[in-house]
Each structure stands twice: as structure tokens, then as C-alpha cells.
Amino acid sequence: SAYTEGLFYLNGFLYESTGLEQHSTIRKVRIDTGAVVQKIDLPPEYFGEGIVNWGRRLISLTWKSHVGFVYDLASLKKQREFHYEGEGWALTQDGKQLIMSDGTPELRFLNPETLQETNRIQVTLDGKQVRNVNELEWVKGEIYANVWETNWIVRIDPKDGHVTGVINLGGLLGSADQGLGPDSVLNGIAYDAKGDRLFVTGKNWPKLFEIRLKKRGEPGH
């Protein structure tokens, strides 16, 4: 039931960041039970956003404060801060660099050591900009991204920003979405590369889903 802003899978655990001022956290969660095994609170003035792992570090963004944090991955102790222009929405990595969304149609590429920007691409679908690109995940050479306030995950070519496919997750929650507010949108993608498992969730959602993708028209599984 967390206000999920960032999500990734690592070594059998989910790492999740949650938002809202005075309530933002980063936590390590058992994937089988949902039990929180480790947690830190962000300072109350910060609205937590996306997170990603890089080596022995965990890197996190904040929404409008222009500041991010670097933590020791094992202990979740803060090591340092870094700064960026604009808003911070989400992070992922491709094994060589970090990839950041900021709510615009652009994705930024960051040097994982200096955390300085090295490149940007425009996300487009059929020649039109895709706005509100939110939570990110690197999946089999593509960037998967939630589009805020939609049921979409778009698949983005990291070379040119072109959307190569759209995953429609409308109706995924079913009856479990009753009583959730308008802010409780799809947001959160995590990929277990070794097990080829794809997980999704949303803000305040009571469930995490493992999904398998099929092309439109294929029979269900």
C-alpha cells in the first residue's frame, strides 16, 4: 500500500522508494512475503522519487528539490548528495550509464560515477512526443517506462527514443482498485534478468504483479 515512486529487483529482493513529503522512504522488501527487511526515512522536506543500484551503491532522486542522494547499498547509509536541474522522476541503468526521467518527453543519460549528464533523447510515439515519462526499467536492451496517469508501459529504443511498443495494463488490479484514489496510478517496474520475471505495481496498490507479455490477439495464459 506504499506510494511507490521507484522500484528495482536485486538478488531476490525488491528495493522500493516511496514519495510524499514527510513520508518518503527507501526500503528493501522480501519478494515472497512483502515484508520490509530494511528501511530508511528521507528528511521530511524531501519528496522521494526514483532509485537505482550501481555497484555497491543505491542512488535516489527527489522530485522538485534538485538534489539526489547516494547510499551504501548494503547498509543504506547516506554517502553523499548530488545536484541536477529540473525535476527528478525515475532512474534505471543499462550496465554502462544511468538513465533518468524528469516528467518531460526527454530521458537523460548520466555518468554513474560523476552523476553528470552526458546525453539526452526525446521519447516519441508515431512522431509525437510522449510526455510524463515516469518509472523506468532496463529490460532486454530496451527502456520500459510508465507513462504517468495512464495504464501504459512504453518500450523505448535507447538509441533514438522511438517507442517500439505499448503495453496496456488497464484492468490489471480488477476489483482490488475499489477505494483507491485518483493518484493511485500504475507506477513501478522491476525486472529479474536472471529469472526473466517482470514485476509491476502502482501507487498505493495493495498488490505486486508478475506479468508475462503477449502480442495482441494471442490467446491468454
Language model: regions and residue ranges:
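Residue-level detector of Asp-centered blade-edge/turn motifs that repeat once per structural unit
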Residues: Y9-N11, N53-G55, Q93-G95, W138-K140, ...
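Blade-loop segments of beta-propeller domains
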Residues: T33-V70, K77-G88
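Beta-strand-rich domains and repeat architectures in extracellular enzymes and scaffolds
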Residues: S1-T25, I40-V52, W89, G202-P206
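Signature of short aromatic-glycine-proline-rich micro-motifs recurring in repeat-based ectodomains
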Residues: T4, V133, L180-Y191
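Surface loop/turn motifs at the tips and blade-to-blade linkers of beta-strand repeat domains
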Residues: S1, K39-P44, R80-G86, I121-K128, ...
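Conserved beta-strand positions in repeat-built beta-propeller and related beta-rich domains
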Residues: Y15-L20, L58-S65, M100-T104, A145-E149, ...
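Short loop/turn segments that connect beta-strands within beta-propeller blades
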Residues: R30-G34, D72-L76, P112-L115, D157-G161, ...
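Hydrophobic, well-structured mid-protein blocks that either form specific transmembrane helices
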Residues: G68-D126
